[in-house]
C-alpha cells in the first residue's frame, strides 16, 4: 500500500489554496508504490498526482524536482512538478515534504513487447540528451559510500560463493576510476510499474 500518510479532502483543499489549480474535485489514494504516499488529485484545472515523501528530505528533493521540471520543459513526457504561488516546487504537508505534479495518461504494462521496450529505450535516450543541459549535480546515492556500508550487511545473508562474488564486485568497484567516465543524470528507477504506455 502506498498511502502511508492519510490526508483528508479538507486538509488537501487548504494546502492547494497555495496553488493556482482551482478547487479540489476528487482525491484518491494510489495503492501501488513502496516508498512514498501518492494520491490522484483532480481539481477544476486538471488531473495531478500528489506525492508525500516518506524518506527523502526537503534538502534532497530540489535536485529531483528541478530535474523533472527541466525534462518536462525539454519535451520529455514525465510528470511536471507544479510550483506554488511563491514559485516553489516543494511544499510541506502533514510535516513532510510534498509536491504536486501533472498526471500522465497511459497505463503500466507488466509484459511489454519488443516494440514497447524499443520505444522505452528511445525515450530513455531522449531523456539522457535532454539531461545534458541540466547543470545541477548531486552525489550518487548508491555510490561508493553506500556500497561500503551496505555490502557488509548483505554479506551476512549470503552463502560462501555469493559472498565471494560480492567481495569481488566491491573490490572491482573500489578500484575503478569513475571520474574518467562520462557523467550525467540517469533515471535509476526504471521498472515496468514506472512506465506508462498508451
PLM feature spans:
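An alpha-helical support segment within catalytic cores of ATP-dependent transferases
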Residues: 7-18, 135-136, 147-188, 198
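ATP-binding pocket architecture of kinase catalytic cores
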Residues: 43-135
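Short, conserved clusters of charged catalytic residues that mark active-site
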Residues: 22, 63, 168
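Proline- and acidic/polar-enriched loop/turn elements at helix boundaries
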Residues: 28, 83-84, 139
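Terminal low-complexity/disordered tails
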Residues: 142-144
Amino acid at each position: 500500500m502506498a498511502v502511508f500518510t492519510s490526508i483528508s479532502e479538507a486538509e488537501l483543499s487548504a494546502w492547494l489554496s497555495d496553488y493556482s489549480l482551482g478547487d479540489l474535485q476528487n482525491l484518491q489514494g494510489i495503492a501501488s508504490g513502496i516508498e512514498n504516499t501518492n494520491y490522484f488529485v483532480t481539481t477544476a484545472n486538471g488531473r495531478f498526482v500528489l506525492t508525500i515523501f516518506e524518506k527523502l528530505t526537503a534538502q534532497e528533493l530540489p535536485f529531483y524536482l528541478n530535474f523533472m521540471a527541466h525534462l518536462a520543459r525539454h519535451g520529455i513526457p514525465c510528470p511536471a512538478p507544479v510550483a506554488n504561488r511563491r514559485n516553489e516546487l516543494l511544499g510541506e504537508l502533514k510535516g513532510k515534504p510534498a509536491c504536486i505534479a501533472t498526471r500522465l495518461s497511459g497505463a503500466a504494462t507488466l509484459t511489454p513487447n519488443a516494440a514497447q521496450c524499443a520505444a522505452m529505450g528511445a525515450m530513455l535516450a531522449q531523456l539522457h540528451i535532454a539531461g545534458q543541459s541540466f547543470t545541477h549535480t548531486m552525489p550518487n546515492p548508491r555510490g561508493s559510500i553506500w556500497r561500503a556500508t551496505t555490502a557488509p550487511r548483505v554479506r551476512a545473508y549470503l552463502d560462501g560463493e555469493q559472498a565471494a562474488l560480492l567481495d569481488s564486485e566491491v573490490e572491482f568497484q573500489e578500484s575503478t576510476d569513475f571520474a574518467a567516465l562520462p557523467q550525467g543524470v540517469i533515471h535509476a528507477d526504471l521498472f515496468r510499474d514506472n512506465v506508462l504506455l498508451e
